[in-house]
């Protein structure tokens, strides 16, 4: 919906929302009033006042009465219009909570001001008014390069009279600026004298180009913000999250600490910055960001890996030279004092006055997807928003290490606003995915002129994203193996190239580009062709990553067999071979005694005859998903009724994007059994099922380097294959170390051979990265250091005998009468009379769970087993949605165990399932 904002009245600082239907009614009433007024004027023109007679005077009285009636009608219509306008105003006020001015921020402004830390060599006062045409022309002529396009000829001149001006600081090229020195020369010269600038000073300042926030080579990028040292200062920052957008001079309602956000939700709040000292404090920059990162800790290596996959900057909340209107559309007047006596906004002077509080409002909208550059391997599933997972116990000197899960509540926190929420999500202490609202003040040390963090504050958020396509149980093992095979082929190709040049080294022969890459993109076989080795290797990696972009289409449409060209369902299969002696008396279980049939007795031909066959079990991977499960306190706080209007509309919009089949939660699995009896076996009834049990398997994998391939449950749960994979890449890792050492020892000789036949070409350096790039090295280290943790949970689902549906006795009797007569029916009747409860349970178990064997054709039977998946309401664990990121992943499986009578064995199958947040 597109909202049209009126530029007229702005009550409480919010623009009114225009309602089309109500406005049309008002215009219609106004049109009717104008028509009546025009008709009244026409009537008056037909009764002129000149030449009135007594009869005319009577008509005049009638006209007066008519006019008064018209006035009353007009007043009545005005009341109706006013009432409609008031209704329109009330409807506008009711929709203010949903109002959002969704405007794309200026990339130039972000690139110039927030992408790096400004160094302040521009006087902020000069940004208040635009320069004159003469100043712009003078500045342009100064900045423009000369005819030879040399930037070095544009020089900086120190401002006369500056105490900090150095003799050798009067000539610096624009490309070699030192912003810290330049800014002091400029700002100090304009303020040290304590007087207004002369005309000569104006001329000198106008010649200084505005390199602040523009010259990327001289500024400190925001990525280095996290490596700056922290300084202890008397500055305090407090972050508050509110339920709705804050309105100046009104106290907002704060959000609950247990609040969970999802994709598309809006996060409102404000920051309080207070200088508690008696002296003013200068700062360089103030940032308010929404950030998310993954933390992986390797205790053996003593290594902590952080991958920041999300950083959103609120331009209106962070410091800037001007006041940016917030996206909420609220009219905020900088410099005013709010209800808590805090000054709204920060001054251009970048100074915090003593014992003064400042306030900055912020608003963030959670994205539905990350940027493509988030994953270098271009895995689409890695570019989806992952859920909050564990907590970072090692952050801020182990500030959150003391958080424990309350056994009653099922979660734990510090008890203060902004604390992370710890649940039993089965994430170890060395792995976490965190979302925070961060506020940082960057300052500068007066003695060393180096930047530092004067104060920082964070507010932890709990995010459970909406389930978009990408992470699904439908992705099969073929995709994983294909990507793994392509990666291994590339690594083997690089090793072969290294072996070639080492052989050339032994033979003292010249090294060509064909030896390095075994290819020539120029289309010729000239070994002296000047090729960029890094470019060739980059293209090979790009080609490898292009295949990663192609996700499995199994979740969208059935896969096809390349030979038969027929659709093949995404199935999980297993089989069991059985063999047992045929006896007159069968040692069956209690249920089989209850439900034995006449075929069992008739098939017993002799005590020494063996019955054998094969049972095949197949389950189709379900498209439905299990619901995200959290502690009851979190579920109660985040129920649909407790959400804001914007969050309700956002959730309904997201749910409307999903197909109907995905919206339905997974409540059962249809297991198909096929019994194929041996030809040399006597005819017999297939083995009966004695029990059906379920388990919930949790698979968590992590690595301290970016994972290059897409994982699947089949690979991660196969211990033998996983160990072979790790062993192979550990061997690759060892080879890389040996090759690197040998290359460095013979670096000079290798470069001599590489440039031997390059007489007419510029000499080039041969590097080890031309063979094994940093990306390939990362891929090897990632799979070599892969760690997988598998947890079996036995109490997630209810037992099958506790999932029976209640049926009427008539229905049960009809179903029971439809069964073929049994030779042991008298025994069953006796048992039913004796153990009525057991008979009822056995009947329901057969009718609702295991059903009966059906003969399809000679020596072949089929059976459908319904495995109910009803969650236990007393689950202590938290089942977070499936996730797959560059450093970690979480998958789930439902393990179904079917046990047969007479100790014939059991069948076990692991069905991959998804856990998604589809219900509130």
Swiss-Prot record:
InterPro entries, alphabetized: Bul1-like (IPR039634), Bul1_C (IPR022794), Bul1_N (IPR007519)
Region ranges (Disordered): 1-89
GO biological process terms, semicolon-separated: positive regulation of ubiquitin-dependent endocytosis; protein monoubiquitination; protein polyubiquitination; ubiquitin-dependent protein catabolic process via the multivesicular body sorting pathway
Pathway as given in its UniProt record: Protein modification; protein ubiquitination
Record keyword Phosphoprotein present: yes
Sites bearing Phosphothreonine, chain numbering: 22
Composition bias type Polar residues, residue spans: 1-10, 35-57
Intracellular or extracellular location(s): Cytoplasm
Compositional bias (Basic and acidic residues): 73-82
Entry GO MF terms: ubiquitin-ubiquitin ligase activity
Modification sites for Phosphoserine: 557
Subunit structure: Component of the RSP5-BUL1/2 ubiquitin ligase complex composed of at least RSP5 and BUL1 or BUL2.
Domain notes: The PY-motif is required for the interaction with RSP5 ubiquitin-ligase and the HSE-mediated gene expression.
Family recorded in the similarity comment: Belongs to the BUL1 family.
More details: Present with 339 molecules/cell in log phase SD medium.
Name of protein: Ubiquitin ligase-binding protein BUL2
